[in-house]
């Protein structure tokens, strides 16, 4: 059963993967924790967007283990797309926008792992991706 919105669930899963696979990157774990708080308290995405780009950015983290690496990259893409578009499209709720970003990433033809994309999207929408990270 869904407990949090999709964006929060995606951020929590990013944090969980990082805590599990690279606990030595406490600065990025803390960064994601702030992103979660910023979103839940103020519906703010600016801090999260600052994580991308430049030397030593979120995009420069080492590989995660197994499918965590693919899931981590998938979630980063979805969260970045959402953060970039949030507040720029009038008349669309954050939840609907996140669903669109998730659908776009899931359906992207250039991704070689269509079944995994669909499984990630399904569990993210259901709010149980965190519990299923090691099953994917």
Predicted regions and their residues:
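Residue-level recognition of alpha-helical structural elements
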Residues: 3, 21-28, 41, 47, ...
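Short, cationic, amphipathic peptide segments
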Residues: 58, 65-69, 84-88, 95, ...
């Amino acid at each position: 059963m869904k407990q949090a919105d999709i964006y929060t669930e995606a951020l929590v899963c990013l944090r969980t993967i990082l805590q599990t696979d690279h606990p030595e990157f406490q600065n990025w774990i803390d960064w994601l924790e702030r992103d979660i708080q910023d979103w839940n308290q103020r519906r703010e995405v600016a801090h999260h967007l600052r994580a991308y780009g430049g030397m030593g950015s979120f995009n420069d983290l080492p590989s995660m283990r197994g499918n965590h690496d693919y899931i981590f990259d998938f979630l980063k893409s979805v969260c970045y797309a959402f953060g970039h578009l949030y507040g720029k499209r009038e008349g669309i709720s954050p939840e609907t926008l996140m669903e669109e970003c998730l659908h776009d990433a899931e359906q992207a033809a250039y991704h070689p792992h269509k079944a995994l994309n669909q499984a990630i999207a399904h569990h993210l929408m259901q709010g149980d991706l965190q519990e299923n990270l090691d099953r994917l």
